[in-house]
Amino acid sequence: MSATTSEAPNSAVSREASTQSSSATTSQGYVLPEGKIMPNTVFVGGIDVRMDETEIRSFFARYGSVKEVKIITDRTGVSKGYGFVSFYNDVDVQKIVESQINFHGKKLKLGPAIRKQNLCTYHVQPRPLIFNPPPPPQFQSVWSSPNAETYMQPPTMMNPITQYVQAYPPYPSSPVQVITGYQLPVYNYQMPPQWPAGEQRSYVIPPAYTTVNYHCSEVDPGADILPNECSVHDAAPASGNGPQKKSVDRSIQTVVSCLFNPENRLRNSLVTQDDYFKDKRVHHFRRSRAVLKSDHLC
C-alpha cells in the first residue's frame, strides 16, 4: 500500500514538471511562447471555417469530459482558425498534443494553452496641444543702469512759417482763416535736442547764414493805388550823384523778400492780395468814369 501511494505523488510531480517544461520546448515543430500554462486546456489550431464548436466538442470527448470549447473570431464574427478546448478532469495534455489528429481531412495543430503574462501598460491620456505664442518683445527706452538716461522722442514741431501764414481777414470781427489756395515752400529748421535737467550735453550748432533784408515800403490802404512796382534802395550808391532807384517788379521783390526774410512773407503776400482787389476796384471805377465822360462828350 505504501509503495502504491508513493508512486502516485511521484507521477503527479513528474507530469507537472513535464507540463511546465513544455513552455521552453517545441510542440510539433513550433516554438511555444513564454507564459503560464493553463491546466487541462489544449490549444487547437488549423480549424476550418466550416467547423463549429459542437463538432469540436464531440471530437475531443474521447480524451475526457469537455468543459468548454472556444473558437476565436474577429470583430465581424469570422473564425480566425484557432481556439481552445478545456476539460473538467485531469487529462494528459502532452499525450493529446503528441497525437496526430486529422479532422475533416485537415491536420490540426495542437499544443498546450499558454496564457501570456500581462505586462503593465500605462494608459497615457493625450492632452490637448495648447500653443502659447511668445509675448511680444518689450522695448524699454530707459536703461537699467543707475545713471539712467531717458531718451524721449522730440514732439512734432509745426513749421513756424506755415504756422503763422494766415489769410488777411476781410472784417476785423471775422475769425482767422488759413490760406488753402496758395502752396508755399516749406522751410526746415533744426532744433537742438532736449536733455534732462541737471545734465550737460554738447552739440554742434550749424553756422549762421547772413540774411539780407530788402525793405519794401508799406502800402497805406487809404492812399491811391500805385503802379505795380516799388523801389528798392541799394546798400551803397552806384555813383556820386546820390542813391539811385531801381524799378523792380513787385511780384519778384515779394518772392526775394520772403526767401531771405520769412517774417515779411505774410505781410508782403497779404498786401499784394489786398492791393490786387483794391486795384481791381479802382481800375473799374476809373473805367466807369471814363465811359461817363465819353458819353457826356458825345
Swiss-Prot record:
SUPFAM superfamilies, sorted: RNA-binding domain, RBD (SSF54928)
Effect of residue 43 to D: Abolishes RNA-binding but not homodimerization
Expression sites by tissue: Expressed predominantly in testis with lower levels in ovary. In testis, it is expressed in pachytene spermatocytes and at lower level in type-B spermatogonia, preleptotene and zygotene spermatocytes. In ovary, it is expressed in maturing follicles. In embryonic and prepuberal ovary, it is expressed in the oocyte and follicular cells.
Residues carrying Phosphotyrosine: 276
Protein's cellular compartments: Cytoplasm
Predominant location category: cytoplasm
Recorded family membership: Belongs to the RRM DAZ family.
Protein name (database record): Deleted in azoospermia-like
Lineage: Eukaryota, Metazoa, Chordata, Craniata, Vertebrata
